[in-house]
């Protein structure tokens, strides 16, 4: 006789059965997968004990693919079909790809995202990333002995909506359920903060293969709050390799190189950089296709000299993030280093000098992000023990707003707001009988729409015709935990609604974000004057238009002289509104407003008499 197992809906019939979830660090150079086993997070290795999976995919003519070390081993021989650092291309168009002239790939400028021509056909960064994620999923299932319920995948804090969506798409293509996208610095904070029960202000300095992130965190009991973020999505260890490659070419006086020679020297450059983490000098040897021999000695002094500008380039966003957080370097309790590139002695020295303390390095910088992601995945899968609930508060990098009359920007969600977040604001119509409203979604810190980045446009139609100012349109901005923005506009009387989900076809580079912030600081005074001028002009237009309508409907309440006086005031407002003096416009508007007070009172009396006509006193009681 078989026994039927009965359990609560949605619950496992085995009360102690764990739901298997993993954390994945989808890196530019290397990727990792980690899981919590026996309450301890650990990185899962392959059958040969290797934790790191090179983020390299090679496509073959038979349409199969090699992933990881096998692909990396063939990179020199088959550079065009061996894709490295694909993370740099996620959500990017062809014009956004940095150092494209040094790349051996045949790019295809496809709509929305660049693609790469390979022996197995044209491949998108989403498809290539999916190969890496599928390999990590298989490794995890082999190690854990069961299927996964999902994964937490980490992304740089500065990934925009298009890049985050591309990451989600890659995961789904790899057969992974995305429990959450988690910012890499936040993942590091989970690993360090909980292991060490840390509280206070911390900085997470994350220099990976292709991206740099700096986050200022406030760690208190149960709450991880990101006070500010910054960084550069086109700066990482690869750039140090690239600079060293240029030095090799210069020192060896090499002629234009083939793609295979270029890849060979890049491999040698990366090996030399890594060797200097343990030694004061190293030798670079290579034999090119032409038979030419490269033999150079690289010292740590030379390496520091030729890469000093890259080190300094990382410190500019650090200063900016500290200013945004309202703290000084001396207030930072500790500095967490993340990413394999932070093993470079020049980086550790520069960070230590800047903050006046030795950075924390007790966790492997290559693994710390994956470990934190695994802890978060374990929590989301429902495996946490009592007291293991954490609140993760990430932030958005730039303010989100909407264009209003006069080309102004009304900020709905200010930058550095914690996410997920939803904010709403009510707007109204400008003209009588207006039945539609254009919604222009903007990103940036400037006061004028023309100076901000346009994210999306849509229209709300079907607004009931009313007098200007009577309709109420509620505009709601919602940013989810993955940083994706949705905007909804709803007319409150009729319930008509329109919405848009913002997935920009091209990503926003971090130097663009830095430039936008710098412009907002530099142009703050000018912007405020421009805003004041635009606001006064809008008010002038509104009052003149309202007065003109009143004259058309109730002009008989005025004598000829009174009407002439009002029209003269209107003409003065129109003329002054074309000028640049917002105070003069305000004064003219006030004169028109005061000059029509008596007219407004007479119109009110007429309206009241009209409303009461034929009514009995008892009806009014």
Curated annotation (Swiss-Prot):
Keyword ATP-binding in annotation: yes
Pfam families attached to this UniProt entry: HSP70 (PF00012)
Keyword Magnesium attached: no
Gene Ontology biological process terms, A to Z: iron-sulfur cluster assembly
Family, per entry: Belongs to the heat shock protein 70 family.
The protein's name in its UniProt record: Chaperone protein HscA homolog
SUPFAM superfamilies: Actin-like ATPase domain, Heat shock protein 70kD (HSP70), C-terminal subdomain, Heat shock protein 70kD (HSP70), peptide-binding domain
Coiled-coil segments: none
CDD domains referenced in this protein's UniProt entry, alphabetically: ASKHA_NBD_HSP70_HscA (cd10236)
């Amino acid at each position: 006789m078989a026994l039927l197992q009965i359990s609560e809906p949605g619950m496992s019939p085995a009360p102690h059965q764990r739901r298997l979830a993993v954390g994945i660090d989808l890196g530019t150079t290397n990727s990792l997968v980690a899981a919590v086993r026996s309450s301890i997070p650990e990185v899962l290795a392959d059958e040969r004990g290797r934790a790191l999976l090179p983020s390299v995919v090679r496509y073959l003519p038979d349409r199969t693919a090699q992933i990881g070390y096998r692909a990396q081993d063939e990179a020199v021989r088959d550079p065009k079909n061996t894709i490295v650092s694909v993370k740099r291309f996620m959500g990017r168009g062809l014009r956004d790809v940095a150092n494209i002239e040094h790349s051996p790939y045949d790019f295809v400028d496809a709509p929305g995202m660049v693609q790469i021509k390979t022996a197995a056909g044209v491949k998108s960064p989403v498809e290539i990333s999916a190969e890496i994620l599928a390999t990590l999923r298989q490794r995890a299932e082999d190690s854990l002995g069961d299927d996964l319920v999902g994964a937490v995948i980490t992304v740089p804090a500065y990934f925009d909506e298009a890049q985050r969506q591309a990451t989600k798409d890659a995961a789904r293509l790899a057969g992974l359920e995305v429990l959450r996208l988690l910012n890499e610095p936040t993942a590091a904070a989970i690993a360090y903060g909980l292991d060490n029960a840390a509280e206070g202000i911390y900085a997470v300095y994350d220099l990976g293969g292709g991206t740099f992130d700096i986050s200022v965190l406030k760690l208190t009991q149960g709450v991880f709050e990101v006070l500010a973020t910054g960084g550069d999505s086109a700066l990482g260890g690869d750039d140090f390799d690239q600079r060293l490659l240029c030095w090799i070419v210069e020192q060896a006086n090499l002629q234009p190189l083939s793609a295979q020679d270029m890849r060979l020297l890049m491999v040698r450059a990366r090996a030399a950089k890594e060797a200097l983490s343990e030694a004061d000098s190293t030798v670079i040897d290579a034999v090119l296709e032409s038979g030419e021999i490269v033999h150079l000695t690289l010292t740590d002094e030379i390496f520091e000299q030729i890469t000093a500008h890259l080190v300094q380039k990382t410190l500019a966003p650090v200063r900016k993030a500290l200013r945004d957080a309202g703290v000084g370097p001396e207030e930072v309790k500790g500095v967490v280093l993340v990413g394999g590139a932070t093993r470079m002695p020049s980086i550790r020295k520069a960070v230590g000098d800047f903050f006046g303390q030795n950075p924390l390095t007790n966790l492997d910088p290559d693994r710390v992000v994956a470990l934190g992601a695994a802890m978060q995945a374990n929590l989301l899968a429902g495996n946490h023990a009592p007291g293991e609930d954490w609140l993760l508060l990430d932030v958005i990098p730039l303010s989100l707003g909407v264009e209003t009359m006069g080309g102004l920007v009304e900020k709905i969600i200010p930058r550095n707001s914690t996410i997920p977040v939803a904010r709403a604001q009510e707007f109204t119509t400008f003209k009588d009988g207006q039945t539609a409203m254009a919604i222009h979604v903007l990103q940036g810190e400037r006061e004028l729409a023309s100076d901000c980045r346009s994210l999306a446009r849509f229209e709300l139609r079907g607004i009931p015709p009313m007098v200007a100012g009577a309709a109420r349109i509620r505009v709601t901005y919602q940013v989810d935990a993955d940083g994706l923005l949705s905007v909804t506009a709803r007319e409150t009387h009729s319930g008509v609604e329109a919405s848009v989900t913002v997935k920009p076809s091209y990503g926003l580079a971090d130097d663009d974000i830095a430039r936008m912030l710098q412009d907002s600081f530099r142009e703050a005074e000018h912007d405020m004057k421009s805003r004041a001028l635009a606001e006064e002009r809008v008010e002038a237009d509104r009052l003149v238009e309202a007065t003109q309508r009143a004259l058309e409907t109730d002009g008989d309440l005025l004598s000829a002289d009174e009407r002439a006086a009002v029209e003269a005031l209107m003409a003065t407002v129109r003329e002054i509104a074309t000028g640049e003096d917002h105070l003069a416009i305000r004064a003219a508007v006030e004169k028109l407003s005061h000059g029509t007070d008596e007219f407004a009172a007479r119109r009110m009396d007429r309206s009241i008499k009209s409303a009461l006509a034929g009514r009995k006193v008892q009806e009014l009681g």
